[in-house]
């Protein structure tokens, strides 16, 4: 929403991120980035890394996590994973989103599996390279509006944090959230 206001919006976004860090909050940049490798590398540096300016490396937006669209494949994800390893940051990859039309693509069958399940498997694979104490720094976005898919995806990604949008106004219910929880203790 910040971007609709142009440069002033981005400046305000930066100030918001800085303020949250001053308050010791974890910042998730819901930016849904993803592109070809070189462009994803630039996005990864901008949101999670440090950019070289002369002799200095300085953070740009400096979120702790960013949401990423996997539709372009590993070419678009790998640059983010590399920056996350270097900077000890994380990702939330779109797997099964909460919006009503998400099924137009995410529910398509490829062989015996839905596309969202295959993406979940890749999230688990990518996440195995970026493990914290119990959970991976590579998480997933799975909408509260799809509790059955959430139940399946929790099994596919047992060590991934799941960011669960869609609770409340979009129709996700509290009792459905249990499917998104894991038995791993932090």
Predicted regions and their residues:
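Short hydrophobic/aromatic-enriched beta-strand-loop microsegments
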Residues: 160-165
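Conserved, mostly hydrophobic/aromatic
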Residues: 30, 66, 166
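Conserved small/polar residues in nucleotide/adenosyl-binding loops
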Residues: 185-186
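Catalytic cores of alpha/beta
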Residues: 150-153, 173-181
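Conserved anion-binding
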Residues: 35-138
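Active-site glycine- and acidic-residue-rich loops that bind
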Residues: 4-6, 68-77, 141-149, 167-172
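Surface-exposed amphipathic alpha-helices with a cationic face
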Residues: 17-21, 81, 85, 124-128, ...
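N-terminal active-site wall of soluble small-molecule enzyme domains
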Residues: 1-59, 149
């Amino acid at each position: 929403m910040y971007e609709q206001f142009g440069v002033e919006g981005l400046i305000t976004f930066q100030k918001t991120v800085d303020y949250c860090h001053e308050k010791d909050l974890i910042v998730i940049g819901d930016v849904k980035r993803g592109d070809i490798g070189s462009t994803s590398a630039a996005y990864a540096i901008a949101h999670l890394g440090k950019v070289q300016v002369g002799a200095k490396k300085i953070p740009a937006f400096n979120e702790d996590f960013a949401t990423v669209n996997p539709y372009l494949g590993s070419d678009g994800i790998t640059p983010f994973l590399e920056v996350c390893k270097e900077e000890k940051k994380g990702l939330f990859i779109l797997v099964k989103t909460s919006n009503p039309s998400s099924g137009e693509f995410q529910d398509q069958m490829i062989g015996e599996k839905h596309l969202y399940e295959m993406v979940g498997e890749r999230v688990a694979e990518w996440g195995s390279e970026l493990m914290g104490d119990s959970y991976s720094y590579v998480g997933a976005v799975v909408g509260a509006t799809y509790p059955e898919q959430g139940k399946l995806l929790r099994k596919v990604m047992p060590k991934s944090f799941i960011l669960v949008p869609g609770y409340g106004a979009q129709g996700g219910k509290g009792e459905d959230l249990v499917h998104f929880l894991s038995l791993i203790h932090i």
